[in-house]
């Protein structure tokens, strides 16, 4: 919960988490050959008035995506938003966290509305590959320890490729996230989808005019001058 870390995370800096508990396991005689895993994530949603409005949906839970476990695919519906109208480009970001996505084992995939997602460091057939990546699709290298293979932990955020709005269309109100595998077993426990949406932004406008209708804002006036205040509203958002 946010309240656990609010008093600790008060400024920019380096924060270290330790002693995340996990039971001991052995891959040799464990039923699905995965052993045990543990990890943690801190997902922060912030407000920036300079950015376009977004619908942000987050899911926390736990699921096993496994061929041997009989659960090789999982569809997760996302709704409650409306994307921007045509012809504007639809922009979206996707954040995620999983356990046990092994680097050398292929077959794990992430799809959005039926389209495979990938980045330079996350191939479409080995998306969960024991790495920590950022919005630029490059690894996060200022970690400690800074191993290129986390041995079973994945977290990151990526820009959803959406050429010609072919993955997420204009005026869309829902999407489907699909996690699947044909080989590697992995355990997703968090994801979030942020989609640009239609949003008005009403700004109050105020103009001071003289008796002739001239704008006299910032000009000195004399005692007895007639002043007219013109109040209005201006929508600076993307909703008509």
Protein language model annotation of sequence segments:
Residues 197-240:
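Exported/extracytosolic protein signature
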Residues 50, 85-88, 102-104, 220, ...:
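A short beta-turn/strand-edge loop motif at beta-sheet boundaries
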Residues 1-33, 119-187:
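Cysteine-clustered segments with highest specificity for TGF-beta superfamily mature ligands
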Residues 96-98, 104-110, 232-240:
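Low-complexity, serine/threonine/proline/glycine-rich extracellular segments that form mucin-like
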Residues 50-53, 83-94, 227:
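Extended extracellular/luminal ectodomain segments enriched in beta-structured repeat modules
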Residues 21-73:
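A short "linker-to-beta-strand initiation" element
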Residues 40, 92-94, 175, 189, ...:
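Hydrophobic residues positioned within well-ordered beta-strands of beta-sheet architectures
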Residues 68-85:
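Short beta-strands within extracellular/lumenal beta-sheet-rich domains
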């Amino acid at each position: 919960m946010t309240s656990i870390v609010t008093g600790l995370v008060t400024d920019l800096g380096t924060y270290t988490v330790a002693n995340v508990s996990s039971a001991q396991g052995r891959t040799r005689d464990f039923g699905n050959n995965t052993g045990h895993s543990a990890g943690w994530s801190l997902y922060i949603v912030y407000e920036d008035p300079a950015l376009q409005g977004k619908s942000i949906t987050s899911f926390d839970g736990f699921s096993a995506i496994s061929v041997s476990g009989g659960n090789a695919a999982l569809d997760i519906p996302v709704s409650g938003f409306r994307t921007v109208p045509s012809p504007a480009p639809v922009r979206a970001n996707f954040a995620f966290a999983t356990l046990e996505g092994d680097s050398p084992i292929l077959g794990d995939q992430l799809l959005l509305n039926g389209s495979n997602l990938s980045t330079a460091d996350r191939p479409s057939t080995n998306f969960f590959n024991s790495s920590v990546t950022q919005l630029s699709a490059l690894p996060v290298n200022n970690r400690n320890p800074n191993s290129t293979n986390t041995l079973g932990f994945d977290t990151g955020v990526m820009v959803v490729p959406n050429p010609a709005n072919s993955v997420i269309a204009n005026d869309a109100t829902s999407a489907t996230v699909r996690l699947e595998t044909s080989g590697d077993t992995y355990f997703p426990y968090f994801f979030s989808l942020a989609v640009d949406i239609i949003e008005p932004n009403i700004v109050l406008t105020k103009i001071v005019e003289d008796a002739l209708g001239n704008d006299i804002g910032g000009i000195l006036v004399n005692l007895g001058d007639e002043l007219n205040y013109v109040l209005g509203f201006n929508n600076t958002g993307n909703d008509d």
